[in-house]
Amino acid sequence: GTSNRYATAVRKSFLITGGAGCLGINLTRFLLAKGQSVTSLDISELDYADVRDQINAIRGDIRDTTTVDAVMREVQIVVHTAAALPLYEPHEIFSTDVDGARNLLKAAYSHGVERFIHISSSAVYGIPDHHPLLEDDQLYGVGPYGQAKVEAEGLCEEYRAQGMCVPILRPKSFLGPERLGIFAMLYEWAKDGKNFPVLGPGDQPYQFLDVEDLCEAIWLCATLSQSVTND
């Protein structure tokens, strides 16, 4: 079972950027169940009563260097999930997803953080012309979000070249508790026996990831040997 395979490890201090988001809250619960120490940094209020008193929740912007430097002081492992999503204005996407990542990497490096786990996106592959995609395939960022994600990975590689352990994960769209937006609506309609629209003939495959599986992948990046995870 999961509990045997991912046994509780040594207690570490984790910083989760975007801690109030879907991945952030699921990862927070996952890490707390592992006995880990969690600090959340998010521009939004963290409004989950089940974890609020068990973590250090800081409201702040990753684009603010003073905030980033302050929260990084006691941190051993960073999980960088914060991002401006594709619907945001291009300048917001680049300032958050590129400049924000640069601020975090710089502070993590200067404070000697053990690992910086960067949550990228399958958007770095653009519109693929073949399957399956491999981690060493060419990156083609389509649109501001895809371009920003490619640039942020480049920053990660720069700091990895300076000796930091910087695992990069490229998840597909993920689903799970707290996932808002259209998915929540579709599930509600299905649960209530209502009809909901199907695009096209209804047979086109789309790849989703369970957020719990993503949390386990992050945990492995945090706990396995650097020789395995630092790529």
Give a label for each model feature.
Residues 153-177:
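Conserved beta-loop-beta element that borders a ligand/cofactor-binding pocket
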Residues 63, 92-103, 143, 147-148, ...:
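Glycine-rich NAD(P)-binding loop of the Rossmann-fold in SDR/ketoreductase-type enzymes
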Residues 53-63:
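Rossmann-fold cofactor-recognition segment
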Residues 62-96, 107, 124-127:
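NAD(P)H-binding glycine-rich loop region in Rossmannoid oxidoreductase-like domains
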Residues 187-196, 206-231:
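Alpha-helical substrate-binding/gating segment
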Residues 14-34:
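N-terminal Rossmann NAD(P)H-binding glycine-rich loop of SDR-like oxidoreductase domains
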Residues 142, 172-180, 200-212, 226:
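Glycine-rich "substrate-gating" loop/helix at the edge of Rossmann-like oxidoreductase active sites
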Residues 99, 103-145, 159, 167:
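Conserved Rossmann-fold NAD(P)-dependent oxidoreductase catalytic core, especially the SDR/UDP-sugar
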